[in-house]
Amino acid sequence: MSLPAPDAPSIYDRLRRTDEELFALFISGKARRELSAVFGAAEYALLAQLARQAQRVKRQRAEAVYLLPGIMGTQLGSTRAAPTPDDLLWLDPQDVIGGGLERLRLPDSAGLRPLGAIPYSYLPLQLRLRAAGYRVIVHEYDWRCDLGEAARALAARLGEESAPSVAIIAHSMGGLIARRAMALAGSERVRCFIALGVPHYGSFGAVQAIRGTYPVVRRLAALDRLHDAEALATRVFSTFPSIHQLLPTRSLSPSADLFDGDQWPRSGPQPIAELLRGARSFTDELPACDARCIAICGTHQRTVVSIRLKDDDFHYEISDEGDGTVPLASAQPGECAKYYVRCEHSELPRSVSVARAIIELLRHGRTTRLAAQRGPALGRHVTVSDLELRSTWNEKIDWAALSPAAHRSYLNRLNQPPPHYAARRARKRQRH
């Protein structure tokens, strides 16, 4: 396998730009070849069109819109002196291949900082909002770290905002940061909070990330020549306070207190006791959503909806009641307004229909573009264990042998459910 020298900038390093610099590149057509290689020709054409539409807007609305990415949704890396590009670690596959994810480990990682939201995930929504006349501020943050600290940083930034009112659009874990920040001084001007697939009561994906059975962890391990999924889980992902703070609360997981390490399997990767204690405190103190919250919930995707411990292994119940990552029961809190869309978790901020609904919600406080009632559940329930999930994606990927299109597909589908989900569901249908 031919790889660049460790210090040689990759194509992902070279294209690590600020949002404004990226917009200018899409408008001008410069770096078209490299951008098309990373985004694909169709995505490049879409982003160029959206950037030109946003450029034509002459007058911005008075309200500021803060966009918060979800977990793993902010690029992380280290800055380098110009003209050398910044060293992008998350998510640069060349670094993953060489075992570089070890640099994410806490608390001993040094020199890493947020380097903007993942462009593929959040540029389309940002540009559509700009084209609608909104001033969009992307609030990047280190998604590994304590969410309470991230909330305080957001509240401080909101307190310095000059706009007369603020709207927050938060995807996934970013919504927990927003909820916490909205109870702190500095957030008084927040008029509305649009929650895109926010795991208000946690996600079982956090359990699987710690156990090394989460799709993202396993697919990254397939690229990593030095670590398997269990090693990545133990040495890297289980060191993040944020992942522990995403564990399901008792309202979502009544059969298991997942903040109690004694209720986890004794074998395999484990949570960290100190982080479990901090996570319990965070979730216990998280303020309830108020009337400013509007939830947009993805539905009808294969999602882990419950868990049980059996024979020293976790067994997960899977149904279509969720967005593939966040169970529907976790995405729709309290009495806030709720809307539903058949969409995968990672596609919520990319969806055209969701973006149009968000713009209507910002303007009018309601929308007709999404369903106000959830559709009927399909009634398909299967179970899968950690043991079964560990049989997936064990073969290493030769990244250099893949085409640019295969590179894009692999990175854009890191959270794709494992084959067991579809196979077991198909067998269940056959039995009926």
Question: What are the residue ranges of the model-derived segments?
Answer:
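N-terminal non-catalytic accessory region
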Residues: 1-233, 237, 316, 322-328, ...
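Alpha/beta-hydrolase fold catalytic core
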Residues: 137, 145, 233, 240-315
